[in-house]
């Protein structure tokens, strides 16, 4: 069975059905890549580039397309190597690698369908009978009564863990993010103490500082350390992205200074870029994304890098349904996965693509059992969510404000 074509589909739909996330973000875009064959099977993957800059994806897919025509899926890492090498001057990290990720995922999906096996079986097999899942909740909705309602909503959906952002978000007023060490530490400790009292001692709680892409200001190492130490009594699973990605050495110093586990890595592309962070022990828990890092195989390479340093990984997954399932398969195949990120109460670009293939029971995800990634992209889904140019998310900065 040989590849006959590679094509891109861009879509725009509701970001989520979660009423608490919809206060901050209403629409999302997505980029799906399909690989067609002379045997009739179609491989389907997603690149997280479709969430940020969807208009760029088709041109990059077309750049790589000739390398795949006439090929089989017998050796996916070799096909990936050829494409990566072809883009050597511009693709070693960044956008080219992110789009390549979606192509590689479609290749794995195709191979799984051809062999009748789930993708995690092709990556070495599921290393867990189940994995804990958390609801990724976006901002800390305020006032605190609203935050409590948010937690209760996620627990009602069957989650036992959740993650919220640093600072606060109040509908009609916007974001508040304390920056000075004492102010930030006091604010976050007060908030997490409230969350722990409300959720109970057994709930899995996480915080995302979002400092990897904060366009206005980022915490200094002093502020990040103060916050992390202030959160030590509350037994967080992790504190995510408390520093910018330009400072792996600062991250390493932060890890040494606190018992709060420090997580990060969602903005890193390819094992090549991850290596310095792994070697410096910059994260207690790395967060590769199997729709962004370069591919499911690259995810496995990163996971091994972290395991070799005695560290864990936790999937990052904020793309649509393809992205989510790519990360679930990779998370099960990696032997050092701590927890899976799951978009709660998701809308059509998740539910229709996943099509019942994600099973969560008592707060844990079970290994997917459908051939390939277990995702679909129907003609009805294409019709109902036509692409809207400009619907990709971008960081709001002076002169370029995010609208929805």
Positions of predicted regions on the chain:
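Metal- or metallocofactor-binding catalytic centers and their adjacent structured scaffolds
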Residues: 36-115
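Shared catalytic-loop signature of beta/alpha-barrel
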Residues: 62, 229, 235, 244-372
């Amino acid at each position: 069975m040989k590849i006959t074509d590679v094509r891109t589909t861009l879509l725009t739909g509701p970001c989520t059905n979660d009423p608490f996330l919809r206060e901050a973000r209403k629409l999302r875009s997505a980029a799906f890549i399909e690989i067609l064959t002379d045997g009739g099977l179609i491989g389907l993957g997603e690149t997280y580039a479709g969430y940020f800059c969807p208009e760029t994806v088709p041109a990059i897919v077309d750049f790589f397309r000739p390398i795949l025509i006439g090929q089989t899926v017998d050796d996916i890492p070799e096909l990936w190597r050829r494409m990566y090498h072809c883009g050597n001057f511009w693709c070693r990290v960044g956008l080219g690698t992110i789009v390549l990720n979606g192509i590689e995922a479609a290749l794995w999906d195709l191979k799984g369908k051809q062999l009748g096996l789930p993708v995690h079986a092709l990556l070495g097999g599921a290393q867990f009978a189940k994995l804990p899942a958390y609801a990724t909740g976006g901002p800390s909705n305020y006032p605190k009564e609203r935050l409590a309602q948010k937690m209760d909503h996620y627990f009602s959906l069957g989650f036992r863990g959740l993650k919220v952002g640093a600072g606060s978000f109040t509908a009609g007023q916007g974001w508040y993010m304390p920056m000075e060490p004492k102010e930030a530490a006091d604010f976050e400790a007060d908030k997490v103490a409230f969350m722990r009292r409300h959720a109970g001692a057994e709930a899995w709680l996480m915080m995302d500082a979002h400092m990897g892409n904060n366009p206005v200001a980022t915490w200094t190492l002093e502020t990040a350390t103060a916050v992390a130490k202030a959160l030590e009594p509350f037994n967080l699973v992790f504190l995510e992205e408390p520093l910018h990605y330009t400072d792996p050495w600062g991250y390493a110093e932060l890890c040494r200074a606190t018992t709060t586990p420090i997580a990060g890595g969602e903005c890193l592309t390819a094992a090549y870029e991850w290596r310095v962070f792994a070697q410096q022990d910059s994260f207690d828990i790395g967060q590769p994304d199997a729709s962004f890092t370069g591919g499911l195989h690259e995810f496995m390479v990163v996971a091994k890098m972290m395991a070799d340093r005695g560290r864990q990984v936790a999937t990052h997954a904020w793309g649509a349904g393809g992205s989510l399932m790519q990360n679930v398969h990779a998370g099960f195949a990696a032997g050092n996965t701590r927890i899976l990120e799951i978009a709660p109460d998701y809308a059509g670009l998740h539910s229709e693509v996943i099509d019942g293939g994600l099973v969560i029971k008592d707060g844990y995800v079970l290994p997917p059992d459908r051939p390939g990634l277990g995702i679909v992209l129907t003609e009805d889904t294409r019709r109902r969510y036509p692409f809207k140019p400009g619907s990709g998310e971008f960081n709001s900065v002076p002169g370029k404000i995010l609208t929805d």
